[in-house]
Amino acid sequence: MIFRSVSNTDFRARVRTLLLAGSTALAFVAAPVWAFSIDDVASKAKDLAGDKYSAPTSNLPSEFSEMKFADYQQIRFINERAYWGKLKTPFKLSFYHQGMHFDTPVKINEVTATTVKPIKYDRTKFDFGSLKFDENATKDLGYAGFRVLYPINKADKQDEIATFLGASYFRVVGKGQVYGLSARGLAIDTALPSGEEFPRFREFWIERPKAQDKQLVIYALLDSPRATGAYRFVLRPGKDAVMDVQARVFLRDKVSKLGLAPLTSMYLFGSNQPSEQHNFRPELHDSSGLQIHAGNGEWLWRPLNNPKHLSVSTFSVENPKGFGLLQRGREFSRYEDLDDRYDLRPSAWIEPKGDWGKGTVELVEIPTPDETNDNIVAFWNPETQPEVGKPLDFAYRLHWTMDEDELHDPKSSWVKQTMRSVGDVKQKNLIRQQDGSTALVVDFEGPALKDLAPDAPVTTQVSTDSNAEVVENSLRYNPVLKGWRLTLRIKVKDPKKPVEMRAALVDEAQKPLSETWSYQLPADE
């Protein structure tokens, strides 16, 4: 039996009614008489969608809203005072203080077997360092967001494994991982001239876990000028962190582009787009490419770029089996960064549940001068949008992993790396001379290639758009990888326009031996 959104008084009254009904009636009440579910949140989301949008208001004193980042960093949550700290559950909660642009509180509630109660702001849970402020001004401030703590790396140490902070952003890590890319609840009109709308999680409900629980359940209410939504997250920590997401979205008004299961990452430079300035780090990115597993079984890999101009790429898919932003290549020598450890940043893989129908996986690449800006976005854009006020239900599993080999077709092969340089031709005197072309070197490896003889009849299928001429298409065995290396040299006709290319390895019967390499050479490069 489910009673939604009941107060403690209502709950006690209903229990009292059941008791008065006698022992016969009680015999039928074996399960708890109250439970919280996504339907409770969806009811709130539907009601919100029927009302005019009300923008959140800030209650933050100026000494916090105007502070610099260095000052905000001084505000430290005291983990010894974590929520559920005295309970035997392995999960604990800590909270983000408001400050800078995190200037609007979110409501956070605890759900138990019998009640829902707000988790109230407590200033004594924070160490403010050398900051000076009026303590009375923070009395009813509220939290900006929260973290989930769990002993993921050591049994006696609580590590931060998930964070919900800002708009509808959240990040998760598994064992041995460090924070990298983010996920979001919903994206609206991303990269459109009209401007992007950022929905916001305005309220959370977190189920108090039992001592033996290995998962944490979080509910969230999303709100924005043109959409509302109810979300249920089930977080399972481990070597890979797995999060099951269930959502019900309502539109207040029509949108031009609806982004489901959005991911946000950063790409500054890498082997397929080397840094224009000398840098001891060969690569600097949270993710190296977009991977798609289409409904027809095709696997596609798209290396990321940091373009000079905004770039939007669309990949038409029906009933996608998966897509995500991956960090392929875990060797420390690729990054050489002891501080930020890009080699330990997870990939995020979206595994849709059920059929999502027709639509596109969209990749947005935004120019950025440094690594402080998230400039990569990927999401699913359904071909058919829900009617205003009607629910859109969807669900997916989100994997946060460093084991990218598990995200391939185990019988095929995939791109190990893409390298770009100026093209050249070896002269009779053995000196290489540049010829005005751009060279792309693509290494393929995997089970489909590993056991083939070096002289096996492996060939390529290569295509480009009309803005490029292919002047070299050569394939050779790579004994280091026990795979094959494809070298392409192209001459760009109009440098002000990008070039789209695709390539795959096939056998003598033209049967695919690899995923499809889909590459865009950005404009003005």
Swiss-Prot record:
Keywords, in A-Z order: Periplasm, Signal
Subcellular location: Periplasm
Record Gene3D superfamilies: 2.70.98.10, Immunoglobulins
Pathway(s) annotated for this protein in UniProt: Glycan metabolism; osmoregulated periplasmic glucan (OPG) biosynthesis
Any Pfam family hit: MdoG
GO molecular function: carbohydrate binding; catalytic activity
Signal peptide (UniProt feature, chain positions): 1-35
Family, similarity comment: Belongs to the OpgD/OpgG family.
Function: Involved in the biosynthesis of osmoregulated periplasmic glucans (OPGs).
HAMAP family: MdoG_OpgG
Name used for this protein in its record: Glucans biosynthesis protein G
Record organism: Pseudomonas aeruginosa (strain ATCC 15692 / DSM 22644 / CIP 104116 / JCM 14847 / LMG 12228 / 1C / PRS 101 / PAO1)
